[in-house]
C-alpha cells in the first residue's frame, strides 16, 4: 500500500473517494481491528503516507520520529508520512475544522464555545476555538466530572454559549435521529457545528435550523479539507488553491451521496420523473409506495380500508425512515408524505427535496389513490398540502410541459444545489 487509511472500522469512510478524486493516486482502506494489528502494521512501515482514524490517533504517535508541535499539543496524529523509514506525524483535523469554521463564517473571537464530548476530536476543536480567540471553552459530557469543570447537557442549555461544537457520534449513521442538546432553549446561539458528516445533517443540525440558528453545518467539508491538507503532506507540495479544491471535492461528494427526494400531489409525475432521473444519474430508484406494499403485503387501498389513513401514514413513516438515512438514491414519495414533520426531517437529513408542481386540474382522479376520489377532493387536498410541499422543498420543479422539460429543470436545480 502506498497511500491509505488505517482505523478500527472503516466501512462508511469517504476517504478513498476523496483522495482519488483529489489526486488520482490509489488510496486503500485498511481496517485494523485490534491494537496488535495496528502495531504490526506500523512496525512494518510498508507505505508512503497514511491517514489514521479512531482508535489509533494516539497510538501512532509512539512510532513517529517527528511530531508536528500542533499535533503534539492536541495529543493526536491523523496524518503520517514515511520519509526513508522515519515516520513524521501531523494533525490535519485541526486544519480541516478551522477551514470549516472560516468557510461558514463562524465567529469565535470573544465567544463562549460549548463542546459536546470528551474524546479525541474535543481537543482538536478546543485548540481551534482557543487559537481563534474564544473567551471561554466549556465541555459537555453525559457523565460530567465536576473536578474538570465539565457540564451536563441540562447545564449546557443554561451556559450562555454562542457557539456549539459536537464531537460525539450522536446522530451518526446508522443511528440517526439522536440529539441530547436542546438547542431550541438556547436563544443566544450563533452557530452549531457538527463534525459528523453522515448523514449530511444530523438531528442536532436539523434542530438548529428549526431554531433559526444563523449557522448550522455538518462535518463533510471538514472531512474534505483535512484530506486536502493531508494530501499536501503526502505529496510534499501545496495546492495552488486549497480552498477551491475543498469546494470542488465537497460538491462532488454531495452530488454522489445525497438522496434526491421527489414530493408532490398524487399523479403529479413523481414516479415518471423519478425513473428518468434515476436512469440519467445512474442511481437506484425507490418508490416508497411500492416499498410500503412490499413490507405490508397488502395494496394501499386495502391498507386504507383496514387501518385508515393514520395506519397507512405510520407504515409510510417507517419506510421513509428506512430509506431516508441511506445515500445516493432517488426517492419517489407518496403525496401525503409531507403531512408528518418527522418524514420531512428524514428526507432532509441526507437528501435534497424537489417539489414536483403540476396544476391541480391536470391531476388524475380516482384509480388506486384513496384520497383522490373526486376533483373537489383533489382541490381541497392541494390547498392543504401546497404550503407543506413548499416548506419542505429545496427547489420547485414545474411539470406543466413534457417530462423532458421537467427533467431538464430538475437537473438544473440539482446542479445549483450540489455546487452551492
Question: What is each PLM-predicted segment?
Answer:
Residues 290-345:
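ATP-dependent small-molecule kinase phosphotransfer cores
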Residues 132-149, 289-291, 295-296:
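NAD(P)-binding Rossmann-fold cofactor-contacting core
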Residues 349-388, 395:
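A glycine- and Lys/Arg-enriched "phosphate-lid" helix/loop adjacent to the NTP-binding pocket
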Residues 148-216, 337-343:
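Rossmann-like adenosine-cofactor binding region
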Residues 31, 195-258, 399:
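Adenosine-phosphate binding glycine-rich loop
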Residues 2-104, 199-201, 205-207, 211-217, ...:
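Phosphate/diphosphate ligand-binding glycine-rich loop within oxidoreductases
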Residues 244-255, 260, 276, 280, ...:
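NTP-dependent small-molecule kinase module
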Residues 7, 89-94, 101-102, 106, ...:
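Glycine-rich adenosine-cofactor-binding loop
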